[in-house]
Amino acid sequence: MDLDSPLFNTLHHIMDLTDDTTEKNLNAPTRTYVRDAKAMAATPADVKEHPNSYVFMVDMPGVKSGDIKVQVEDENVLLISGERKREEEKEGVKYLKMERRIGKLMRKFVLPENANIEAISAISQDGVLTVTVNKLPPPEPKKPKTIQVKVA
């Protein structure tokens, strides 16, 4: 049988298709990766109340501090957002598997009335963002007003 026969040409074509398909599947994001990318928007957070402050701890693994924003909107809503980005691909380098999550995340928290929006600090360490919102001092109790009664 000749190597240029239609049968061998067909077999080579099928083998080339299989190689291309296998290579594409190795480089394609997995279903888990696509599904879990949505999880970046619902990142876990804990909120604690201390005697003088509220502390918000938000998991932000792999998010660089320069890609994190902490804002107050509408005078009482703490908005925390960030984005985990994929590294730029270098020429000649390709992913064989993509499982790590990338994407944007955002969490909003309604602040209590006694939150001091002028005294907020944030620090990112070991993949956890800690935002501290100090409390306003309690209002002083109102003293009764005494009205002087005049003689007519």
UniProtKB/Swiss-Prot annotation:
What is one term from the GO cellular component aspect held by the record? cytoplasm
- Protein family (similarity comment): Belongs to the small heat shock protein (HSP20) family.
UniProt main location, coarse? cytoplasm
Keyword tags: Cytoplasm, Stress response
Q: Which SUPFAM superfamilies match?
A: HSP20-like chaperones
Localization per record: Cytoplasm
Q: Which organism is it from?
A: Pisum sativum (Garden pea)
Task: Please state every residue range assigned to the domain named sHSP.
Answer: 36-152
Please give the PROSITE patterns that the UniProt record associates with this protein.
Answer: SHSP (PS01031)
- What is the protein name for this chain? 17.1 kDa class II heat shock protein
